[in-house]
Amino acid sequence: MPSIEVQYAVAGEPLPLPGDIRRWVSHALQDRRDDVELVVRLVDEAEMTALNQRYRGKSGVTNVLSFPYEPLPGISSGLLGDIVVCAPVVAEEAVRQGKSLDAHWAHLVMHGVLHLRGYDHHHDPDAYRMETLETELLAGLGFADPYN
């Protein structure tokens, strides 16, 4: 069973329960469930803006950031990394995009997990592969396609 730590560093927003976050993470891990450790941190806009500037060199807030763990050569570890999700942005995007809050939370948490697993969306073929997998994973939990 994966070790999934959920940290709440934000208040006042409708936030998912730790059990829901763990379920979404486990579902996105697929076959890597047994040996994995990761952290999901829910933050406010100030913390996310600071992280986005510091680690991506981009000003402003974003919805989710993933920080993969990169072990030293020869070191084997189940540590996958950290996912940081900005709760106010998730809530605002869900309303603007006409999605349920749970569906959008599930999507962004699983999106973060896929980044930790090595997926990216910087080039069209990679984006298509990642978005297709996200859609399949969400459908497996009863959520609609987030891209349609």
Predicted segments, located by residue:
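An acidic/histidine-cluster motif and surrounding catalytic segment
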Residues: 1-106, 116-148
